[in-house]
Regions:
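Nucleotide-activated chemistry modules centered on ATP-dependent adenylation/adenylyltransferase
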Residues: 2-6, 10-292
Length: 292
């Protein structure tokens, strides 16, 4: 039973502070996000060495630094993407972007950070058909297609800027530990999906195994254990011992039968309309021959 509250009596809450959902701009309407940050798509597209940086935690900052060193980017547009499953420090991505600017110095301009999101796209890829996917492929985790979503949500922005590269910070191994969302086959599938849109997905640290190498990229100024946005689904695929064990054949079938074709369907639909019926697109993939 809820305690009775008399008229005029203020309600109390045990939470430290009221939760406010993070604000974002619809990923499908990239020019709006740019305008809200005081940026102009045409002038940015004219810059020859521009890249979009995926911003999350330390690995994403390390990836951005590595990409600048390897490809010579002189302008980075930091972006974060809302998933609806996050909790914690809402300012963490923006703070990471600021630290990135300090790391790179005056030779690289780090633009104001953008926050994007597409709840309907996330729901279609991860939520609506979760039981169907689990039964069909014998593997299921919201993390699998969430990483595809994180990349896809930046595609309209990239295209608005002339198809500039997107830099991501995924790693195939984290000190010998695997993350189901960052398996080699899945990363390759995401690269191919974005390539269909004419966008290069760069993964400069995907084969960086050791934390010491990441630390060398981000420098001593990075605070160890600094607050970051967390996900309610974190490590949902891990066993009681914390290890990631999965059926590699089932995973390969999932990538071939769902992950890549679903991503491709979204990319192709965007050629015709900015906000397609994502649920219908994913349903069609699951009803198609490749998902059998």
């Amino acid at each position: 039973m809820f305690p009775h509250r008399r008229e005029g009596q203020r309600a109390t809450c045990s939470c430290v502070a009221r939760y406010t959902p993070p604000m974002y701009t619809a990923a499908e309407h990239a020019p709006r996000a740019l305008a809200a940050a005081g940026l102009d798509a045409d002038s940015l597209a004219a810059r020859p060495d521009l890249a979009i940086a995926e911003i999350a935690g330390r690995d994403s900052a390390a990836a951005a630094v590595a990409a600048v060193r390897e490809r010579g980017f002189t302008t980075l547009l930091p972006t974060s993407v809302a998933t609806g499953t996050e909790y914690g420090d809402e300012d963490a991505p923006a703070r990471t972007a600021l630290h990135l600017a300090e790391l790179l110095g005056e030779g690289v301009e780090v633009l104001p950070s953008l926050r994007l999101g597409s709840p309907r796209l996330w729901a279609a890829l991860n939520g609506r058909f979760a039981s169907v996917i689990a039964q069909r492929f014998r593997i299921s985790s919201p993390c699998l297609a969430c990483h595809l979503y994180l990349h896809l949500a930046r595609v309209p922005l990239s295209l608005a800027l002339g198809g500039v590269p997107i830099v991501a910070g995924e790693r195939e191994s984290h000190g010998g530990h695997l993350k189901l969302s960052q398996i080699s086959q899945g990363i390759d599938a995401c690269v191919r999906v974005l390539a269909r849109a004419g966008v290069e997905l760069l993964e400069p640290i995907r084969r960086t195994r050791d934390a010491e190498e990441i630390a060398a990229l981000v420098g001593p100024g990075w605070e160890g254990g600094a607050p970051e946005l967390c996900c309610v689904h974190s490590a949902n695929y891990a066993g009681l011992d914390g290890a990631t064990a999965f059926d590699e054949l089932a995973y390969a079938r999932y990538v071939h039968g769902f992950l890549e074709p679903a991503g491709a369907a979204v990319v192709e639909a965007w050629r015709e309309v900015s906000e397609p019926d994502y649920e219908a697109l994913v349903r069609a993939v699951l009803e198609g021959p490749d998902a059998a």
